[in-house]
Amino acid sequence: TGIWGSDMPDTEDGQTPTLAKLMQQVAEVVRPYKGWIRVLYLQPEGMTDELISTIRDTPEVLPYIDIPIQHCNERILKRMGRSGSTQELRELFDRLRTEIPGMVLRTTGMCGFPGETDEESDELYDFIQEQEFDYTSVFTYSPEEGTLGAKMSDQVPDEVKIERTQRLLDLVEQLGFVATARHVGERCEVIIDGIEESDEGTELIGHTWFQAPDCDGAVHIAEGEAAVGDIVLCDLVDSFCYEMIGEIVDATD
């Protein structure tokens, strides 16, 4: 995502298209409607100075960044056809947290890529533990026909891949629950995504700026009226797992 525009011709005024410029243009469009811009699937090498400053300085762009690293070990990344290392990734995330205070970070880790040793698996585990990402998706490597990885002879045994995956899942669940709980006590806008009916009554389901729809949990509101698409102001009063409990703020509060 971050390198969007690099394969496009310059504009009429001689500017090279970039994701940052596109985000600035979209921000102008959504500004009158108080819209949010959330950018997902940014690659580490695409995090340019221009992009970081645009995320920091454009109010419509949420301070939420999804950078799926897959791994942090340099050798494994090279085998994946990716660049980077633990130290380079550490420096990137340190910079992001410094330049965009309060930001939320999402990433992805892959377990059991061909040739991954116990030590390299531990390196990924330790890095994710160190970084305390707000959200981390974890996947088990699965060979796909025709890919470079599928042709590698040093496939990791399934039972080892499953063990490494479960170990990392246990970690990111703990980190995620703690990160979600940090938002208890905040007052923020919630976009209503749906309305659920049950024997216990009606519940509004929505998401906040720090929750990407359909992957980062939701806000559950037991009392109040709103339609899908409405934006309501809520107090976040409790959390469970990745979910939040919200109470709609009265207009007079």
Q: Where are the language model's segments positioned?
A:
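Short, small-residue-rich loop/turn micro-motifs
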Residues: 2, 68-73, 140-145, 208-210
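Short beta-alpha junctions and helix-cap segments that line functional grooves
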Residues: 51-52, 124, 220-222
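Conserved SAM/AdoMet-binding glycine-rich loop
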Residues: 1-121, 129-130
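Short, cationic motifs built from Arg/Lys/His that form the positively charged side of catalytic pockets
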Residues: 82, 97, 144, 161-164, ...
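C-terminal, non-catalytic macromolecule-binding modules
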Residues: 119, 123-162, 168
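Terminal RNA-binding accessory module
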Residues: 151-253
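Conserved, mostly hydrophobic/aromatic
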Residues: 39, 67, 108, 128, ...
